Amino acid sequence: MALKTDIRGMIWRYPDYFVVGREQLRQFALSVKNRHPAHFSEDAAAELGHDAIIAPLTFATIFAKLVQLDFFRHVDIGMETLVIVQVDQRFVFSKPIKAGDKLWARMDIVSVDERFGADIVVTKNICTNDDGELVLEAYTTLMSQFNGDQSAKLRWDSESGQVVRTA
């Protein structure tokens, strides 16, 4: 395998919490063209039994990405995240994400396999609220293929927020 570190079975706890913002939910709903009133209006959300506006289902990707980035910043797996592709993601919700929620996360590395020269990593992300109640479980499959060819010489420049050539 190309992975430098044996991450199978590893549990990564995100070191901070994530507070879900009301305007953040509205902006996200607009960006994904989800016009459901419960994403914009407390009254519409209350009609559905919620005490705050609710997040579009795909909003969870915002927090999931933060957890993954934190993991890759701290665990040297021996390759750039630029060669990692997310090939599958599935969310299992226990309760809706709402404005004002304080969320906590942990990522479990469920499996690491090599198939046809590619490393395939499956993670299970567990998201809980501040009361410790399960909000959602997310299952993500990541794939990387690294054959030693670094001819493109690319890297992520965090200052510019872009992929740049190094040579």
UniProtKB/Swiss-Prot annotation:
Among Pfam families, the record links this protein to: FAS1_DH_region
Which CDD domains does the annotation name? R_hydratase_like
Q: Where is the MaoC-like domain?
A: 21-124
Q: Which cysteines are joined by disulfide bonds?
A: none
Which InterPro entries does the protein's record reference?
Answer: FAS1-like_DH_region, HadA-like, HotDog_dom_sf
Q: Which family does it belong to?
A: Belongs to the UPF0336 family.
Query: What is this protein identified as?
Result: UPF0336 protein MAP_4109
Q: What is the lineage of its organism?
A: Bacteria, Bacillati, Actinomycetota, Actinomycetes, Mycobacteriales
